[in-house]
Amino acid sequence: MIRLQNARVPIEGCAVLPAKPNPDARGCLYEIYRAEWPGSFSTVQWNACVSKAGVVRGVHVHVDYTEYYTLLSGRGLLGVHDIRRTSATFGQSVTIDWRAEDRSAVVIPPGVAHALWFVEDAILAFGLSQYWRAEFDAVGCRWDDPALGFEIPDGVKNLSRRDSESGSYQEMVRSYERFVSGDNDTASEMAAAATSIAAA
């Protein structure tokens, strides 16, 4: 496990963008995103995610958009795992101890599976390079699949129905590879899964 502060995420395409805090007697102002920063990208949608301690979000992998994560409060463990066969870091994993005081953002490209375990109550803000669509957010696997190689914290896990019912790591990899190859049947399966997500 590594600390995010001043760290490099050893997965191809995953960038850490440190913010520069500007503290004064009132508190602190710091920029969380600038399109001109090295490793940054254009975003079209921003979301805020409020999570309680013990919540797990993931494991998810996106097929057509990049995410920009920044932790505004609290602490979490971020696990990332590369499932892109053409990547120099294919099959590699890292678990990151991420704290709001690190004042850093993490870029997660398509094909990198990821999950967040919230050790404390936390607020996560994240930007997307394309608008979110449920049918393109249905690829994932169980958070505790040993093939991921994540260092999983102890404690009660609170998951969505979707995440608790996710399949295996191998199923996730097959779905991802079929989708990026243009398999129309997989797209239909994902659309059906999206309906289940919306109903959950």
Predicted regions, residues:
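Non-catalytic, conserved peripheral segments adjacent to functional cores
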Residues: M1-E101, Y131-A200
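Beta-strand residues in well-ordered beta-sheet regions across diverse protein folds
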Residues: L71-L72, G79-H81, V107, W117, ...
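Conserved metal-binding segment of the jelly-roll/cupin
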Residues: W98-D121
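Short conserved catalytic/interaction loops centered on acidic-Pro-aromatic/His motifs
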Residues: A113-C141
